[in-house]
Amino acid sequence: MRYAYQLDYKYKHVKKLFEDIEVKPILGMDNPWYYRNKAQFPVKIKDGKVQMGFYRQHSNDVVTCKECKIQDHVINEVFSFIQKKITLKMAQDLRHVFIRHSSTDEIQVVFIGKNEKNIVSLSDQLKNTFANITSIVFNYNTRNDNVILGDTYKVLYGNDYIIEECLGNKVK
């Protein structure tokens, strides 16, 4: 769907939902590419190979990809690096990889799964390759549903947060 059509479609949809309220036209972006600063990538093993990417619509099948055109370039670089380095042994205890990139150029990588022991070497490779990684965290999630994050975290490197700046205010 072309971007101009998306904006028009969304405008008409919101206007229909809120008939009694004035809805102003949507202000689009000059460049609707590479703007997202957070991504969650499911990790699965299928036919003896690691699959990491996005879920196919209305399914639990993982569609692998090399990059996502709406994700920040840095997120795509970290994602590509992890895709190349992740092994079957590392992936067997993982459910998702969560990557954030802040406007202050800090990167956070969160591995989500049952056990962090096989991720330590990948964590070391990441921090040695990307100087602006300031946070690598393992999130324990042993649930069997579609909830991504569990309740318990372990910091593998750096902080348990990254700094974001918004309107002159720095927040964790």
Predicted regions, residues:
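Accessory RNA-recognition modules of RNA-modification enzymes
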Residues: 1-172
